């Protein structure tokens, strides 16, 4: 049986090329000549692919009834098949059933319905953003450089400018000239509270009348009043110079800041009785004044030993305060006064309160605490403060060296006294007379005549003279030493 198999041109070309390489040179030359005359096909044309047909979405391809091609069946097989069909009950599809099943796949299978598209309502119009049509839209977020910023923002709170205003007012040609000649030029640059610095500076210059004129000028400008800061500064200046009668105002309606300024002005002006009366009136009216007012009053009254009883009363009042607010300087000043008055318990409580407020004590506060315990003759407790001061790496000043050396002399601790005396010189301080005297006394107690003579030489070089008591003790030590030698 001869089978005819058609072969494409490209396949025959490759077969001919392969056979030509084996042995037929003549055929190769013919093919080569033909290849030169005919254009070579590209690869995709030589081996074309069958294009993919798009799927038919009208009918489900998986449930389509397959097509059965007729096969050539022998007679014997046909007889066997017929016998089998006769024996078995074959399932026969009726036309109605076939039509019903095929109708299910004529259309695309419905998918899950999508959510209905939701139309969001427009936002309500905002009245503050509506602008009339035809106007240009203003620029937003404009960044201004410091050079282009308003001059008033740079001037109204500048201390040098405000103090300069006070100097210009002071330099007016005559006392009859009004302060408006200076202030009118800068009225657009001033704000509330600006002139309080100018008024205080006029008070330091001794010009209470000019301060009062400045306050009255500010009252005429609505953007500068009402302002308690200007009023408080004016009252403090007038009270300091005993000119409160020049200003008329209602004390009962005065604010806390105004009353505090009045008390401070009275204290600075020496009106201690008036200041004390104002404090008592405020207490009776259940007005709680700032702690700094009590501190200022205590420091001023403590200058007079005859009024120590008033200081004790104010200290008791200050002790009752739960919201105690003291600066480091005020706390140290109160501790020093308490040491003078012998109120050592109050010194201890103030020192503990200050450390409990998470603040580091200064060398002045440490020195005051050591002096307090030394005055109470609690030398060992005072030594603990010295170690605490050294652990805090606090640099000692001359008063601190004086108190520490005095403490070591009281403890008869010659070694530590000598060490701190050497540290004092290394720090560049010049010993005072009481330090020389304490060192001579501790050397005398230990019988160190040579060291005593060295200290006496330093005293002479410093241009000082020993007192009679110290000189007498040196003579006794010298006599004892001479008697031991003989």
Curated annotation (Swiss-Prot):
Pfam families: PPR_long (PF17177). It comes from the Eukaryota. Keywords: Repeat. PPR repeats lie at residues 290-321, 327-361, 362-396, 397-431, 432-466. Disulfide bonds: none annotated. Residues 111-137 are annotated as: Disordered. This is Pentatricopeptide repeat-containing protein At2g01860. The gene is EMB975. Belongs to the PPR family. P subfamily. Signal peptide: none annotated.
């Amino acid at each position: 049986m001869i089978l005819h198999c058609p072969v494409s041109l490209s396949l025959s070309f490759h077969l001919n090329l392969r056979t030509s390489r084996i042995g037929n040179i003549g055929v190769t030359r013919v093919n080569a000549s033909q290849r030169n005359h005919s254009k070579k096909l590209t690869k995709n044309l030589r081996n074309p692919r069958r294009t993919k047909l798009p799927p038919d979405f009208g009918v489900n391809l998986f449930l389509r009834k397959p097509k059965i091609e007729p096969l050539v069946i022998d007679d014997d097989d046909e007889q066997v098949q017929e016998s089998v069909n006769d024996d078995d009950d074959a399932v026969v599809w009726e036309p109605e059933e076939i039509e019903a099943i095929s109708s299910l796949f004529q259309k695309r299978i419905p998918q899950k319905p999508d959510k209905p598209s939701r139309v969001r309502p427009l936002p309500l119009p905002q009245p503050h953003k509506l602008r009339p049509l035809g106007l240009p839209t203003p620029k937003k977020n404009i960044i201004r450089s410091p050079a282009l910023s308003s001059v008033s923002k740079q001037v109204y709170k500048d201390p040098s400018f405000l103090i300069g205003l006070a100097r210009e007012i002071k330099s007016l040609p005559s006392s009859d000239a009004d302060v408006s000649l200076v202030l009118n030029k800068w009225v657009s640059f001033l704000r509330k509270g600006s002139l309080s610095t100018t008024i205080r500076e006029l008070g330091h210059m001794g010009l209470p009348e000019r301060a009062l004129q400045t306050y009255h000028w500010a009252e005429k400008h609505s953007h500068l009043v009402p302002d308690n800061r200007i009023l408080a500064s004016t009252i403090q200046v007038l009270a300091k110079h005993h000119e409160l009668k020049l200003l008329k105002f209602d004390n009962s309606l005065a604010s806390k800041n105004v009353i505090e300024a009045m008390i401070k002005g009275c204290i600075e002006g020496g009106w201690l009785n008036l200041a004390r009366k104002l404090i008592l009136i405020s207490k009776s009216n259940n007005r709680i004044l700032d702690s700094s007012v009590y501190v200022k009053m205590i420091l001023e009254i403590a200058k007079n030993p005859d009024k120590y009883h008033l200081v004790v009363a104010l200290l008791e009042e200050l002790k009752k305060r739960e919201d105690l607010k003291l600066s480091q300087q005020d706390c140290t000043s109160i501790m020093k006064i308490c040491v003078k008055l012998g109120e050592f318990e109050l010194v201890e409580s103030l020192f503990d309160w200050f450390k409990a407020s998470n603040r580091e004590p200064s060398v002045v506060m440490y020195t005051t605490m050591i002096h307090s315990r030394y005055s109470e003759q609690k030398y060992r407790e005072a030594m603990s403060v010295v170690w605490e001061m050294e652990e805090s790496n606090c640099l000692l000043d001359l008063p601190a060296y004086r108190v520490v050396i005095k403490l070591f002399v009281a403890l008869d601790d010659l070694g530590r006294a000598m060490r701190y005396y050497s540290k004092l010189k290394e720090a560049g301080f010049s010993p005072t007379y009481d330090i020389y005297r304490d060192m001579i006394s501790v050397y005398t107690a230990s019988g160190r005549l040579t060291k005593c003579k060295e200290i006496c030489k330093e005293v002479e070089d410093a241009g000082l003279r020993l007192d009679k008591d110290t000189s007498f003790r040196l003579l006794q030590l010298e006599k004892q030493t001479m008697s031991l030698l003989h």
